[in-house]
């Protein structure tokens, strides 16, 4: 079983079409990984599905880096 960090990074790489080695913890989805607003919405949906959790819109807007996604999932996933 992969760690949450590994699973988040894999999803980010798949959703944004970047190499996994480009997905660092400090990487910004928009500035570093080239995501647009639609990409970020799809990314949040993929994270919700993978981790069977709901990410409210107001929380999703605050998740702008890989580490913030990891932290949110660690705090809220089942």
Swiss-Prot record:
One of its GO terms (cellular component) is membrane. Pathway: Lipid metabolism; fatty acid biosynthesis. The modification O-(pantetheine 4'-phosphoryl)serine is found at residue 37. Keywords: Cytoplasm, Fatty acid biosynthesis, Fatty acid metabolism, Lipid biosynthesis, Lipid metabolism, Phosphopantetheine, Phosphoprotein. Pfam families: PP-binding. InterPro entries: ACP, ACP-like_sf, PP-bd_ACP, Ppantetheine_attach_site. Coiled coil: none annotated. It is found in: Cytoplasm. GO terms for biological process: lipid A biosynthetic process. GO terms for molecular function: acyl binding; acyl carrier activity. It comes from the Bacteria. 4'-phosphopantetheine is transferred from CoA to a specific serine of apo-ACP by AcpS. This modification is essential for activity because fatty acids are bound in thioester linkage to the sulfhydryl of the prosthetic group. Residues 2-77 form the Carrier domain. The keyword Lipid biosynthesis applies. Gene3D superfamilies: ACP-like (1.10.1200.10). Belongs to the acyl carrier protein (ACP) family. Carrier of the growing fatty acid chain in fatty acid biosynthesis. This is Acyl carrier protein. The lineage of its organism: Bacteria, Pseudomonadati, Pseudomonadota, Gammaproteobacteria, Pseudomonadales.
């Amino acid at each position: 079983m992969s760690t949450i960090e590994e699973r988040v990074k894999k999803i980010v790489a798949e959703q944004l079409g970047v190499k996994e080695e480009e997905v660092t913890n400090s990487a910004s989805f928009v500035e570093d990984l080239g995501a647009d607003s639609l990409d970020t919405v799809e990314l949040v949906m993929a994270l919700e599905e993978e981790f069977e959790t709901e990410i409210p819109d107001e929380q999703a807007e605050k998740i702008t880096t890989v580490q913030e996604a990891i932290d949110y999932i660690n705090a809220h996933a089942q």
